A protein has these predicted regions:
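Membrane-embedded alpha-helical segments of integral membrane proteins
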Residues: 107-147
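Internal/C-terminal transmembrane anchor helices
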Residues: 154-178
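SH3/SH3-like beta-barrel superfamily modules
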Residues: 208-242
């Protein structure tokens, strides 16, 4: 009992500390002291761990100070946690419009685009809740099917149960896809004003193209210490120094 009370007090103090620190950061932002607000939001992330709200606020600070690479990075991190948040997505597109590189994504089939949009409607936890809800509803319909005396009720329960089973499977796949994106992050943002992408993981490699700050890349090969093989949205690939990018 004593341990429980101590744990509860520690949790309460931590929550109050977080609330005070966030209030200070919010206050600095309202005063238009964006640099101070950014430091405070960053310290909250260090102390409390990832939060879509704090990443979003931090991105707003960097947008105001015209640090576009950091802005894009934090919006991307916020969107990874809360993929269904329209405000984050809008601000991310706004920040991207201020980057130098204009990369036209390669064409993909409709089903791939549709599936990505579906999965990104919400986060893994919410998809999991939907899956549990569909499963429970399916079990209730199974009870109706087994014990109903009306043939019409049995048929309705059976076909509705099949639909819910399919939805349960679909929701679980969506939850897994979002969870996989969280734990196997391949996206990164170019943080340097400019970065050369080379044909080989060496400074002596042939220059293929140049990327600028704020551009997103996907890491294809993460095995080397100093170099990463990356791909941009139009399908071009090459090697870039690790020090000029930050993982989302």
């Amino acid at each position: 009992m004593r341990k429980f009370i101590i744990l509860a007090l520690v949790s309460l103090i931590a929550a109050q500390t977080y609330a005070v620190s966030k209030a200070q950061a919010d206050s600095a932002y309202v005063r238009e002291d964006y640099a101070a607000a950014a430091v405070l939001y960053d310290s909250l992330l260090t102390a409390e761990g990832p939060s879509s709200e704090i990443y979003y606020n931090l991105g707003n600070c960097y947008y105001k100070t015209d640090e576009i690479a950091k802005c894009v990075l934090n919006y991307e991190r916020a969107l990874l946690i809360a993929p269904g948040d329209d405000d984050i997505r809008f601000n991310l597109e706004l920040a991207r419009s201020k980057t130098i590189d204009r990369i036209i994504p390669h064409h993909e089939i409709f089903l791939v685009t549709w599936w990505r949009s579906l999965v990104n409607m919400t986060d893994a936890d919410t998809w999991g809740v939907y899956a549990v809800g569909a499963f429970v509803a399916m079990l209730l319909l199974l009870m109706f099917y087994l014990f109903a005396t009306s043939l019409w009720v049995q048929k309705t329960a059976f076909y509705s149960g099949v639909v819910l089973l399919v939805l349960c499977i679909l929701f679980n796949i969506c939850a897994w896809s979002q969870s996989d994106k969280q734990f196997n992050r391949t996206g990164a943002i170019v943080m340097s004003p400019s970065a050369v992408v080379r044909s080989t993981p060496s400074a002596s490699g042939t220059d293929l193209f140049v990327l600028h700050e704020g551009t997103r890349v996907e890491i294809l090969d993460d095995t080397m210490t100093e170099w990463k093989e990356v791909q941009i949205a139009d399908g071009k690939k090459g090697w870039i120094e690790k020090k000029v990018i930050s993982k989302i």
